[in-house]
């Protein structure tokens, strides 16, 4: 195994970390209706907590309205309660076997809370990226101890690990900044 192999093993994990962050922030409200807004909602169904996607279909009706088509009519009230209790600031209204979810405009205070939440998710992702860099450096040091690479190669590998970290931290910061702008846009 070489230093390059170690880097090739770590980089996909860093990409996956950014993808996880991207998925996480899609569930943060921005004032516009998106189906991913309800991704974290869990419904008490058939004696267990199930993701909303497994009890109904979510669609965007217009810029400020989501429609949830519940497949089992007996689950409408439980689904409505789950959306209301999800702490998203939404007020669902049942209409037969469907639930209309109006997306109210965000207050300045709520926008700031969502920006903080975005930054928290970003910080968690930064920690994950740094842990991956640490793992890469440890793997490189193990290679040096096993005499598989020279000290110069080890030092270059450490520099490569730092460069990789900076590349992905910059991408992460760009994603955070874009989401903050999206949240704060009125």
From Swiss-Prot:
Entry's localization field: Cytoplasm
Key words, A-Z: Cytoplasm, Protein biosynthesis
BP GO terms, sorted: translational termination
Gene Ontology CC terms, in alphabetical order: cytoplasm
InterPro entries: Ribosome_recyc_fac, Ribosome_recyc_fac_dom, RRF_sf
Keyword Protein biosynthesis: yes
A Pfam entry, by short name: RRF
Keyword Cytoplasm attached: yes
Alphabetized GO MF terms: ribosomal large subunit binding
UniProt family annotation: Belongs to the RRF family.
NCBIfam families: frr (TIGR00496)
Function recorded in the entry: Responsible for the release of ribosomes from messenger RNA at the termination of protein biosynthesis. May increase the efficiency of translation by recycling ribosomes from one round of translation to another.
Annotated protein name in UniProt: Ribosome-recycling factor
Taxonomic lineage: Bacteria, Pseudomonadati, Chlorobiota, Chlorobiia, Chlorobiales
């Amino acid at each position: 195994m070489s230093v390059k192999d170690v880097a090739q093993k770590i980089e996909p994990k860093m990409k996956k970390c950014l993808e996880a962050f991207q998925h996480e922030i899609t569930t943060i409200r921005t004032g516009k209706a998106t189906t991913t807004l309800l991704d974290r909602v869990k419904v008490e169904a058939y004696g267990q907590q199930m993701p909303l996607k497994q009890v109904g279909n979510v669609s965007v009706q217009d810029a400020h309205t989501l429609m949830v088509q519940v497949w089992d009519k007996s689950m409408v009230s439980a689904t409505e309660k789950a959306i209301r209790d999800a702490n998203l600031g939404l007020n669902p209204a049942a209409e037969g076997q469907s639930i209309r979810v109006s997306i109210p405009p965000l207050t300045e205070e709520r926008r700031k809370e969502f920006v903080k939440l975005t930054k928290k998710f970003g910080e968690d992702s930064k920690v994950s990226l740094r842990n991956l860099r640490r793992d890469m450096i440890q793997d490189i040091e193990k290679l040096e101890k096993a005499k598989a690479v020279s000290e110069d190669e080890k030092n270059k590998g450490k520099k490569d690990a730092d460069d990789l970290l900076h590349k992905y931290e910059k991408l992460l910061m760009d994603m955070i900044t874009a989401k903050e702008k999206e949240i704060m846009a009125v």
